[in-house]
Amino acid sequence: MSASKATMLILFALFLSDILLVSIPRAEAQLIVPCKTSEQCKSIRCSNGSAQCVNKQCQCPSLKQIYSVTDVSCKTVSDCVASHQCPTGLSACIEGKCICLP
């Protein structure tokens, strides 16, 4: 009886560790504030500089893109590494496109 409990505990631990690996976020959260002029963005506090009105949304200059999508199609990460579009070891294949990670 205790062997089956130990087995169930091990299986549950493996299941839990798998869930934690899958739930890695892909993007940073952003506050979207509509605007027509940069004057309307003065109330937004940015960590580096002041917010500007870009494409009718207030944006901080310190926000950076998490990754850049390339035009290279892929099936695996090896396809991305072979394309030499990203620094070594900083590429991934997501939804059939190579992306460069920061």
Swiss-Prot record:
Origin: domain of life: Eukaryota
UniProt GO cellular component terms: extracellular region
Native source organism of the sequence: Arabidopsis thaliana (Mouse-ear cress)
Name used for this protein in its record: Putative defensin-like protein 298
Signal sequence range: 1-29
Annotated compartments: Secreted
Family affiliation: Belongs to the DEFL family.
Cystine crosslinks: C35-C53, C41-C58, C46-C60, C74-C93, C80-C98, C86-C100
GO biological process: defense response to fungus; killing of cells of another organism
Keywords from the named record: Antimicrobial, Disulfide bond, Fungicide, Plant defense, Secreted, Signal
